[in-house]
């Protein structure tokens, strides 16, 4: 399998398995390589665990980071643990034991202890004679999902056909799949599910179910009829008034999924038959221009001063203009009324985004896609581009505020954007060209400059771009040149090292370009910048620094004035080099620790950002977007929260299919989401509002049995919740939380 997996960041660099005894920086458990994994996930698993999924374990504890305490903490007159920092303030009557007791905190399931998985515990030397307790490791070793599928595999030639009218099998007599439909139904599959009133939710919504006879609800859309010759035939039932064109494929037939690239286009990409004229021209010019810039930069200062006017003119003539200028971009808008759902690896799947849009998210992003696998036509990477039809509707905006962006047309705007990662300019530029060509419903293409994954960082992508500002500028400038009308944006962190923020310089370069290119080429054309208020080194061991985000927001607001100072006043800058022409306004979005409408409004009003991007807060309570819209804390009941689980399940079956494999996929991603959602503490049992994202729940009982179940940190209870809608799990299905901490790092959410 290892031979088939190349480095998705830079194919010229081989994947490096950890040496024996080498300590890994991140605490990730060994995981099997799954067919549906994206390229970066597959490569990371090879690097961490080797090619066979065996764990690398030298018997020593995993590397852990020191927990950084909040500043200005004032202890009470009594024991400072009476009000435990980092523990949600649950009312006493709901605590299983007092909040300061050992069992309410230390004996809580290790899945609740963020520090065990993400930071090195400080310990409490007042206990056990000053000796620190030994903490559980922050990894689940040998994490596996198992496998699931039908006992007998039904041939696709009959899976969607009537019993007596199968399609021609392309394998003929050599086919190893079952062609006897009645035998398959009797012996080759598990019994129909009885959830959802025994009715297929996919068929109920779309009038067809392309899982056909493999559907776990097939009894609700099939029947047995008597033919003229007296034979009884099994047939599938469709509602032609509601179904799409089944010949187009699964998503197109359902009509709810967009941005589906054709198989032919993916094959052409894999065979390098897809023409990329713009990218080729631009990268050729970029290489030539870079050589001349480097030559001039290497001249000593005295050499430059001694140059005659004729030599200076000759040097200017060496510079060649770009082969073409960017197309004028579609206007975009970010405002207080447009909360943004962050790009989330694994969790940011289509069903979850669909649920968040339904609850009020105005802007969404795909999971981070790697440029090289996209250019190679890999199915798993292009699958990340799929969006639900609700994501391609215009965001809700305030017409009074949208006037800030002249010529903004809300009817042409949409919610869904994509995020990519690249380590070299040509990768980002070519990926931007193919995305703008093959993905028709795309709001923006966002360049990830904050991903802290070691594999990505080591190859020069993600947060490594923060330390390579010239390369970052070339990427943004080139992507802007080839992306047609699709705007280019960037997501950055404060910097790579704690205490050494570099966002000021990064933002200035994204806004105006470097000094070596500013005068000749103008602005790079970055339409929006999102700043995550942490460094790469910090990860999630400290609260996001919103004071620094506010300083950066002030810098962005001064953009128009600085633009006037830095551009040639004699010649009006070309509108096509500006991000939101003709205004040239860069939108600025803040990201980090938003968990309530109060946090959101505070960041808008006091930090001065245009909008706020929400990540973990939305995973724990997706109705955060509804709270932002209504301006109040919503105390969702257990039954309401269970309805969201049901919706996710319905959306998952529609996205991944209602056959055995699709049910297993839906269950897996539901459990991944519940590993976050169980951390929610109902507002009605908290002593203080608003809640804090950094607070972990103590051991408590809910207001009813269902609320207690939803709060369980035992993944077997999450399995019970999944069985309410998906029935008993397949005997081969396995699941363990990705970390013992349910708030494991969303690594690609840079």
UniProtKB/Swiss-Prot annotation:
ZnF bounds (C3H1-type): 155-179, 200-221
Any one Gene Ontology BP term: mRNA processing
EC number annotated for this UniProt entry: 1.3.1.89, 1.3.1.-
MF annotations from Gene Ontology: flavin adenine dinucleotide binding; mRNA dihydrouridine synthase activity; RNA binding; tRNA-dihydrouridine47 synthase activity; zinc ion binding
Function: Catalyzes the synthesis of dihydrouridine, a modified base found in the D-loop of most tRNAs. Specifically modifies U47 in cytoplasmic tRNAs. Catalyzes the synthesis of dihydrouridine in some mRNAs, thereby affecting their translation.
Chain intervals for the UniProt region annotation (Disordered): 1-145, 292-319
GO (cellular component) term, any one: nuclear periphery
Binding positions (FMN): 343-345, 419, 491, 532, 591-593, 615-616
Name of the molecule in the record: tRNA-dihydrouridine(47) synthase [NAD(P)(+)]
A Pfam family that the UniProt record links to this protein: Dus
Highest taxon above the source species: Eukaryota
Principal localisation: cytoplasm
Gene3D superfamilies per the UniProt record, alphabetical: Aldolase class I
Comp. bias (Basic and acidic residues): 17-28, 62-73, 118-130
Cofactor: FMN
Organism: Botryotinia fuckeliana (strain B05.10) (Noble rot fungus)
Keyword terms, alphabetized: Cytoplasm, Flavoprotein, FMN, Metal-binding, mRNA processing, NAD, NADP, Nucleus, Oxidoreductase, Repeat, tRNA processing, Zinc, Zinc-finger
UniProt-annotated location(s): Cytoplasm; Nucleus
Catalyses which reaction(s): 5,6-dihydrouridine(47) in tRNA + NAD(+) = uridine(47) in tRNA + NADH + H(+); 5,6-dihydrouridine(47) in tRNA + NADP(+) = uridine(47) in tRNA + NADPH + H(+); a 5,6-dihydrouridine in mRNA + NAD(+) = a uridine in mRNA + NADH + H(+); a 5,6-dihydrouridine in mRNA + NADP(+) = a uridine in mRNA + NADPH + H(+)
Enzyme class: oxidoreductase
InterPro entries: Aldolase_TIM (IPR013785), DUS-like_FMN-bd (IPR035587), tRNA_hU_synthase_CS (IPR018517)
Family note: Belongs to the Dus family. Dus3 subfamily.
